[in-house]
């Protein structure tokens, strides 16, 4: 039995031979003129030839797959930390939004006019 490398090499050689056979133009038979289908002299001949299967690299997404061996206690701690961070962010944004509103709601202190320089 052949190895995988030899099979791949034979498969590749077969595809190359098939491409060469498809790429050749047939010679005109006797009493038949060569016909040019559209296009001018500047076009490359055989532009619509099927080239066989195109081999593409498969992207590696292993970096996106999470590690399956996670201790549940660590995951619980991460969730608690994340929830705490979200609550802190919500509290800060609420304070920022309410700052402008509360500014007009609070009365002036008793000694405000003693220190206020605006007439």
Swiss-Prot record:
Extent of the signal sequence: none
Region (Interaction with SIRT2): 31-89
Gene Ontology CC: one annotated term: cytosol
Post-translation changes: Ubiquitinated and degraded by the proteasome.
Top-level division of the source organism's lineage: Eukaryota
Residues binding Zn(2+), per UniProt: 116
Entry GO MF terms: alpha-tubulin binding; histone deacetylase binding; metal ion binding; molecular function inhibitor activity
Any one Gene Ontology BP term: regulation of cell migration
Predominant localisation class: cytoplasm
Compositionally biased tracts (Low complexity): 8-20
Pfam families the record matches: BEX
Compartments where found: Cytoplasm, Cytoskeleton, Spindle pole; Nucleus; Cytoplasm
Region (Interaction with alpha-tubulin): 31-119
This protein's UniProt keywords: Cytoplasm, Cytoskeleton, Metal-binding, Nucleus, Ubl conjugation, Zinc
Subunit structure: Interacts with alpha-tubulin. Interacts with SIRT2.
Function, as annotated: May play a role in microtubule deacetylation by negatively regulating the SIRT2 deacetylase activity toward alpha-tubulin and thereby participate in the control of cell cycle progression and genomic stability. In absence of reductive stress, acts as a pseudosubstrate for the CRL2(FEM1B) complex: associates with FEM1B via zinc, thereby preventing association between FEM1B and its substrates.
Family the UniProt entry places it in: Belongs to the BEX family.
Protein name: Protein BEX4
Provenance organism: Pongo abelii
Organism classification: Eukaryota, Metazoa, Chordata, Craniata, Vertebrata
């Amino acid at each position: 039995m052949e190895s995988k490398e030899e099979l791949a090499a034979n498969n590749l050689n077969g595809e190359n031979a098939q491409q060469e056979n498809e790429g050749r133009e047939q010679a005109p038979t006797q009493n038949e003129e060569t016909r040019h289908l559209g296009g001018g002299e500047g076009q490359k001949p055989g532009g619509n030839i099927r080239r066989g299967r195109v081999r593409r690299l498969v992207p590696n997404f292993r970096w996106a797959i999470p590690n399956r061996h996670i201790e549940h206690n660590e995951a619980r701690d991460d969730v608690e930390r994340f929830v705490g961070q979200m609550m802190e962010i919500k509290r800060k944004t609420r304070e920022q939004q309410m700052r402008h509103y509360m500014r007009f709601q609070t009365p002036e202190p008793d000694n405000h006019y003693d220190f206020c320089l605006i007439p």
